[in-house]
Amino acid sequence: SNPIRYTVQWDLNDGTLSGPPAVNPNGGMTGYTVEDADFVMQPASRPGYAFEGWYDNAALLGAPVTALRTMDAENKHYYAKWSAPLQYPVRYVLNDSAANPATVPASNLLRYSIETNGGGTIHLNPAFRQGFDFLGWYDNAAFAGGPVTDFPATDATPKTYYAKWQIKSYRLQYHLNGGSGSHMPINPAVNPDRYTIEGAVPLVPPQRQGYTGIWVENGQTVTNIPAGSTGD
């Protein structure tokens, strides 16, 4: 007579978890007889979670089962156990300097899991750096492609984002205050009409026949624009 065939059922326990469904490499094993060789179980997998074993009871009590012994000669039902959601780091490369550091908003996450925001979208807010326009977060150091404004929690991988900046240019306006004809004051051509936060800008005094010129701002004599200055 033929040996009795016993059933094998697999419960992945993934109905309440976020993200893609779990994968069971043992799914083809649906039954056995006492004449079959023992079956060594393979771990299931699920993005965002660590597999912690197959159990022979729904309460996940006792030790995990690693092999089905065919001499047990009974129907089997195995249950997958999963870890808490794995935490993935989010790293921000600010591409700034010690003299003028950038800041990342506190609202930008430093870690996330597949269940963050209910498994939905994680938003990246702009960084700030004095004297620069923020052009976006990029997922590569070469700034190839477009900037990234958000990513799905279901990516379940470590993230690194690179800040891209464009230095701001500020206007310089000169008011020469009076004179006419040969006595018209002159602003030396070497004086720039724009400047940036990086590097001091020396200012050559205005020239007027018979006068000594100085530049004044808010009642103070100005001989240069100091490094670190901003604004028109």
Locate each region found by the language model.
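Secondary-structure capping and domain/repeat boundary segments
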Residues: 1-232
